[in-house]
Amino acid sequence: MKSQFRAERIHTVVIGGGQAGLSAGYHLAKQGINFLILDANNRIGNAWRNRWDSLRLFTPARYVELPGMRFPGDGEGFPTKDEIADYLESYAEHFKLPVQSGVRVERLSRDGDHFLIEAGGLQYEADNVIVAMANYQVPKIPAFAQDLDPSLLQLTPQSYRNPSQLQEGGVLVVGVGNSGADIAIDVARSHDTWIAGKESGHIPWDINSFLARHLAFPMIRFLGHHVLTLGTPIGRKKRPEMLHRATPLIRIKPKELVEAGIQRVGRVIGVQEGKPLLEDGRTPDVRNVIWCTGYEPGFSWIDLPVFDQQGEPAQVRGVSSVPGLYFLGLHFQYSMSSATLIGVGRDAEYVVKELKARSRSAERGRQIRKMPTPAAAESLSIPYARKA
């Protein structure tokens, strides 16, 4: 049995040390609140570093800005995943944010008047908790994937790095979203490649063009940050649809997939004789399958009654139905930009202000409850002021 260490009581614990957690840390420090950030990765930014090697942002660097510190370098370039990781690490160092790395939270529960955070042999007590991570953390893989021949290599966007991982032979990329298209282009340079699934649409312009950089991106940023929000009728109307709709292709276009020699095929509907079965009855002869089929919620470690019937956190702008528990970095938490490097800072400011105000209110309530009643005050010979 692991020995457990009970840490001192902390006002606020932030779970997650990515862009959401660091943004929360910036505003907590600004408000003078005692806090600690816990991150499962051994190094700040590793959630980005550990993604596939060729990954770049879809937006120019000038739109990458966490509160208080802009992204350095060429504002017109598209940052690599390692550049984003280094930026996050520099951000934490610059603002001296208290991040404890290599701590994977296994359970969050309530223990009397405080939260209990359990991570291996460690325990933390907190008056408030900010869960700072996206809704969807776990790759979604269909159940029939387990019926594929064991000799086939199966990967996801979380585990894929570069074509050197792959076995000789064909590659089937399942999912025609941005991750699937990017990875298909990457592997097609060295392997026969198929991409399966229904296209989710695409942005018609070249993101490297002058028009995109100086007209399209500013317009999209304005719409995503100021128009498609919970504060506008159109934002409230569109939110349910946007939460469940696939993002259109941004960098890679369908034409580029064809030009790269990638074969477009229909959906994968099952397994036949150990091979992926397409909806048209074909079974492509591949040795590798990369599942780019989205993600599922990764909040199973939260042992609190805070989820709705769909398994999503019950919250309004990050303030949950459980007093003292907050969320940050959720898709469309307030706006279409909420889960991005563009919009998470604004949400963090709101959440921290709400946390501070509610903490003050809760403390006043505790002080009032501790005050003696008139009868108790008289029995203890304590002067008790009465209204005239």
Question: Where do the PLM segments sit?
Answer:
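Redox-cofactor-proximal catalytic regions of oxidoreductases
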Residues: R43-N50, L55-G68
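A short small-residue
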Residues: L66-R70, G329-H331
